Amino acid sequence: MIWYPYQQMKTMKEPYHIVDAQGVYLYTRKDKLIDSVSSWWSVIHGYKHPELNRAIQEQTERFAHVMLGGLTHEPVEKLSQKLEEWLPGDLDYCFFSDSGSVAVEVALKMALQYHLNRGSRRSKVLSLTHAYHGDTFKTMEVGDDPDYHGILREKRDVVHIPTQVEELERVFAEQGETFSCFIVEPLLQGAGGMRMYDVSFLRRARQLCDQYGVLLIFDEVATGFGRTGHR
């Protein structure tokens, strides 16, 4: 038996049985479906892309995976260098993880450790209403989904605010020196209802985070790879 994600086994609908995929399409034995969510945002370039398939095949003929615990290799070094060239400012270090939830967990841990290393015990996290950042425990806590995660709502070290500059300024004025980080899905909240907000909010968030020594985390699992515009 398979326990499918986000499903109650007694009430779930029969899943589509996929036998092939090409581009944006998924195929059952009799139907052709459009994958409008890119397999939860991960199949960015479509299925069976010839250049990607060729690169994967060439790499697996050498090795499919080598951990980075005390080891390194050319593909990860090349990717790190390319990301450093593309990313703005002084974003010069890359930490690799295996899922969106884990990437967010690592970012939150780094923020807490950063303040500990500076002699501060800041532990609060600022987040947005309607936020979604994953389904591990801490990412569920910083998300804003009472239907799924109500058991965690009694936690007091996460503050949620709407995407309004006035509320942003108010919460920083009142609690800014207690926040370790502010985590956002930039410009578009995906799983929270495809909610878009103005870039002026992000610009003000950057200013206030710098003013109060708060780290700003962009969760771009759903918005990266140019989905919100040109870099």
Please place each PLM-identified region on the residue numbering.
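PLP-dependent aspartate aminotransferase-fold enzymes
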Residues: 81-180
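Generic enzyme active-site microenvironment
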Residues: 107, 183, 217-218
